[in-house]
């Protein structure tokens, strides 16, 4: 088992979710392999680390893979990529057969519904001869619909450091904003990871009741190559939870209004 829940997310975000889950009565064990599974009549027994349990159901959520078998790809002249599992496509979703396009879980990068949808738009436009732009795979939003929600785009703090960036971080609690109190968002935070020299937003991470809605303005800012400096001067409506994004940008330089 992995060392933290939500292993693809920033460490600070995962800590918030773990804390909230524990308050909800959920037991969390990380870094402990599930072993000695025994399926009985109406229950499942297993061990994890130095503990054991008997439960009604055991769900193994180890991810999913593309189902490309039986599609007749070879006969159609459609090749798989280096993994031998996913369909090889170019930036416009075109396969090695110029008349065939592929999108979504069958091709590269993350298996996300919103990614597949946008790839479908690109494929149709390209096939129809219209001008189009490839999907920016670096700006794909991760959206986890737990309670609280988790949303992220770009690099985590650890990834940015590993990539050699000198960084600054801005964090703001949603509860610090008036709307955070109104909507009873006591645990949520917005975290920005930015390049120290130029202000580029390298990663944006949110946990909160409406995180998956709040992330959109950060994706737009990053796509338009705006820095945290520009974001910190954009007037946000009051009182809204979106003000947390504004204060997170200001927190990078230590002047969040509602810190």
Regions found by a protein language model. Name each.
Residues 6, 54-55, 67-70, 110, ...:
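Glycine/Thr-rich phosphate-binding loops of Rossmann-like dinucleotide-binding domains
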Residues 27, 79, 166-168:
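Conserved beta-strand segments of alpha/beta enzyme cores
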Residues 52-129, 134:
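FAD-site-proximal beta/loop scaffold in flavoenzymes
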Residues 39-40, 81, 193-197:
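Short beta-strand micro-motifs enriched in acidic
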